């Protein structure tokens, strides 16, 4: 059932692929000469067809210079150094991102801004407008789904840029220029959208479409981050996170997967843990799931997977993060299966011959090491690579792996974090160990397999700073590395601008917890204002 649902959705994504070819043109002719009433009359999957663009747009989140980059790069976990041959310098944009010295003209910001606003205006608001224009009433469930998905796009604008416009309608005057709203106002808007829509959504598992539980999960994340985004007066919102997590748990719709690797396998739609995912399929083409293969693997990696194309040798794990989070010299971490399931490391072998591989010089072993010689002259073999998602044997340029957005493991860990911060360390430890259990051999000593309440609540050094609940933060890293959460985690622990890691010296400037509004947008809209701390 789940498999069929995924494939049907993928075909719908493919049918609208041409509609998503441009993220900067916000006024495409989405349905050509097909009217809304004609679609509803002719299509058994009318609502799915109409809503396809707003889900299909999410496939751009993991493209190069997009959302994944702004949620994981610039943190203690991942980096793109300049290679010794000059590759990946790209005008210094990756080095500036790692050093927190970015400019409002850097392409990441305009790309992400365009992708998110395309999702809101062209993919969500236009659907609502077309129904209104046709004089048709959108059913309550479909309207709730559009509002929840629109809130999903707004969540990322709120997290990354903070102070942004609010646009609920598509039909605006030709020269309309939306006005910047304060972050708190945007937060209140997203909360309202989710609260008013979530209970009108279906309860059954839908994998690649929003249901009631996906909306509640998103709202729980919103409340969890509220204090770090808006101030200490929002600390009480953790109570709401706890309530929402308990509702998801109590629904009995999801459970932890017995296999951590299955969540990120080519058959991820079979995982009982996934609440919401974005499907990719190699037959539907661009955009590709860039960070899991092309962006991270070396260009000589084809024999490892008998692949049709190699990688770009860019994305690497930050060595200090690997050592601090998954220290291979510490048996407690080496026995953690997530260590080898999260990274591509060590000597690589030819899939067909099983023989060890060498780099292009034919002499240097193809052996990824947990060190980077220089941030501006990295060697070919420097750095562990992102290996969390299964790479298909015979991998093409297009990818066949689905992006896991929300999963039940995160629901549990959000609950545990709230309990820990509110003084119930033992309750938090019980949940943490429930999640950890699958990643350790049961024959190992309990002291290896489990974390204690004392460990989780103690002051612990992370990124050179002694912080409360530091071991819990490390555990978040072990469980969720590379899943687009690290920036928010570091901000909640006040480490994003205060922590130190390989090649990164802290700037200790609070305003850097928000990215700048892209300069191109400021030039085209006089009603936008730049975030505090940025001159342009």
Protein language model regions, located:
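Short coil/turn linking the two alpha-helices of tandem helical-hairpin repeats
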Residues: 135, 158-160, 165, 205, ...
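Flexible, polar/acidic helix-loop-strand segments at domain edges
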Residues: 94, 98, 327-407
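Membrane-proximal, proline-rich intrinsically disordered regions
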Residues: 23-74, 520-536
């Amino acid at each position: 059932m789940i498999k069929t649902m995924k494939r049907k959705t993928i075909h719908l994504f493919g049918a609208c692929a041409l509609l998503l070819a441009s993220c900067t043109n916000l006024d495409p002719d989405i349905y050509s000469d097909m009217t809304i009433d004609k679609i509803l009359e002719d299509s058994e999957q009318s609502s799915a067809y109409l809503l396809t663009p707003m889900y299909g747009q999410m496939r751009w989140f993991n493209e190069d210079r997009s959302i994944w980059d702004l949620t994981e790069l610039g943190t203690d976990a991942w980096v793109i150094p300049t290679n010794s041959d000059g590759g990946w310098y790209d005008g210094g944009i990756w080095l500036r991102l790692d050093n927190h010295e970015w400019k409002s003209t850097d392409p990441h910001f305009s790309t992400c801004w365009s992708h998110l606003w395309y999702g809101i205006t062209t993919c969500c608001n236009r659907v609502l407008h077309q129904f209104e224009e046709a004089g048709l009433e959108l059913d309550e469930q479909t309207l709730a789904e559009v509002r929840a998905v629109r809130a999903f796009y707004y969540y990322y604008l709120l997290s990354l840029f903070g102070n942004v416009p609010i646009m609920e309608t598509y039909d605006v005057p030709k020269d309309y220029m939306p006005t910047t709203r304060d972050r708190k106002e945007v937060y209140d808007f997203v909360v309202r959208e989710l609260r008013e829509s979530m209970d009108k959504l279906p309860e059954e598992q839908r994998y690649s479409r929003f249901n009631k539980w996906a909306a509640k999960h998103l709202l729980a994340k919103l409340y969890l981050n509220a204090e770090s985004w808006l101030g200490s007066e929002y600390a009480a919102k953790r109570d709401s996170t706890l309530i929402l997590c308990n509702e998801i748990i109590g629904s009995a719709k999801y459970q932890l997967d017995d296999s951590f690797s299955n969540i990120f396998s080519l058959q991820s739609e079979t995982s009982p843990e996934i609440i919401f995912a974005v499907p990719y399929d190699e037959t539907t083409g661009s955009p590709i799931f860039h960070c899991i293969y092309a962006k991270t693997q070396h260009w000589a990696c084809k024999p490892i997977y008998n692949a049709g194309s190699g990688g770009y040798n860019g994305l690497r794990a930050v060595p200090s993060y690997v050592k601090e989070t998954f220290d291979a010299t510490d048996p407690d971490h080496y026995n953690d299966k997530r260590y080898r399931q999260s990274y591509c490391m060590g000597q690589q072998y030819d899939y067909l011959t099983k023989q060890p591989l060498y780099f292009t010089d034919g002499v240097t072993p193809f052996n990824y090491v947990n060190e980077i010689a220089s941030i501006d002259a990295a060697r070919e073999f420097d750095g562990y690579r992102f290996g969390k998602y299964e790479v298909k044997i015979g991998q093409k340029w297009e990818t066949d792996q689905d992006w896991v957005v929300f999963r039940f493991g995160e629901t549990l860990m959000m609950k545990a974090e709230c309990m820990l911060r509110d003084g119930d360390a033992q309750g938090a430890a019980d949940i943490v160990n429930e999640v950890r259990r699958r990643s350790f051999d049961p024959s190992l000593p309990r002291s290896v397999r489990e974390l204690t309440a004392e460990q989780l609540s103690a002051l612990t050094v992370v990124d050179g700073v002694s912080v409360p609940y530091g071991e819990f933060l490390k555990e978040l890293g072990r469980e969720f590395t590379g899943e687009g959460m690290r920036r928010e985690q570091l901000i909640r622990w006040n480490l994003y601008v205060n922590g130190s890691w390989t090649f990164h010296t802290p700037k200790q400037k609070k305003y850097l917890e928000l990215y700048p509004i892209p300069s191109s947008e400021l030039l085209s809209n006089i009603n936008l204002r730049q975030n505090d701390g940025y001159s342009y």
